[in-house]
Amino acid sequence: MASYFDEHDCEPLDRERDPRTNMLLELARSLFNRMDFEDLGLVVDWDHHLPPPAAKTAVENLPRTVIRGSQAELKCPVCLLEFEEEETAIEMPCHHLFHSNCILPWLSKTNSCPLCRHELPTDDDTYEEHKRDKARKQQQKHRLENLHGAMYT
């Protein structure tokens, strides 16, 4: 019976000469063992990087509010200028109001409200998956704390 290498007309890899072999082997083993990509350092650590810009559709769909009456006393949190009556402001989902010239450049760089950090959706699938994973882990932690608390009450 012929060996695998004779059958396929190839030579065995020299692991000492090609360091990629060990790296690829480790990756294959970790995938086989269902190891997290985070453990391998192959995932961006979003907790230590700026989030991506807000999705264009999310920004386009933000409500525009016409400033009326007592709202004219409010100030834009970015430029600190008071809103003028009948001026149009952009309202974030968290209900903070901004001049469009102030908030649009901000949202082109990051996806959150500059005051409270309420996040808008992004067009970055990796970041959105990170947010879902983080929420799942937080829910799991909360359930475990509740379970632990229920055991000792």
UniProtKB/Swiss-Prot annotation:
What does it catalyze? S-ubiquitinyl-[E2 ubiquitin-conjugating enzyme]-L-cysteine + [acceptor protein]-L-lysine = [E2 ubiquitin-conjugating enzyme]-L-cysteine + N(6)-ubiquitinyl-[acceptor protein]-L-lysine
GO BP = protein ubiquitination
This entry's Gene Ontology molecular function terms read: ubiquitin protein ligase activity; zinc ion binding
- List its EC numbers: 2.3.2.27
| Keyword line | Metal-binding, Phosphoprotein, Transferase, Ubl conjugation, Ubl conjugation pathway, Zinc, Zinc-finger
Give positions of the RING-type zinc fingers.
Answer: 76-117
Write down the CDD domains for this protein, in alphabetical order: RING-H2_RNF181
Instruction: Please give the SMART domains that the UniProt record associates with this protein.
Output: RING
Q: Which GO terms describe its cellular component?
A: cytoplasm
How does it get modified post-translation? Auto-ubiquitinated as part of the enzymatic reaction.
Q: Name one Pfam family in it.
A: zf-RING_2
Q: Where is this region: Disordered?
A: 125-153
The protein's annotated pathway? Protein modification; protein ubiquitination
Which residues does the record list as Phosphothreonine (modified residue)?
153
What function does this protein fulfil?
Answer: E3 ubiquitin-protein ligase which accepts ubiquitin from an E2 ubiquitin-conjugating enzyme in the form of a thioester and then directly transfers the ubiquitin to targeted substrates. Catalyzes monoubiquitination of 26S proteasome subunit PSMC2/RPT1.
Database matches in PANTHER family: E3 UBIQUITIN-PROTEIN LIGASE PRAJA (PTHR15710), E3 UBIQUITIN-PROTEIN LIGASE RNF181 (PTHR15710:SF160)
Assembly behavior: Directly interacts with ITGA2B and, as a result, with integrin ITGA2B/ITGB3. There is no evidence that integrin ITGA2B/ITGB3 is an endogenous substrate for RNF181-directed ubiquitination.
Q: Which family does it belong to?
A: Belongs to the RNF181 family.
* Protein name, per record: E3 ubiquitin-protein ligase RNF181
Source organism phylogeny:
Eukaryota, Metazoa, Chordata, Craniata, Vertebrata
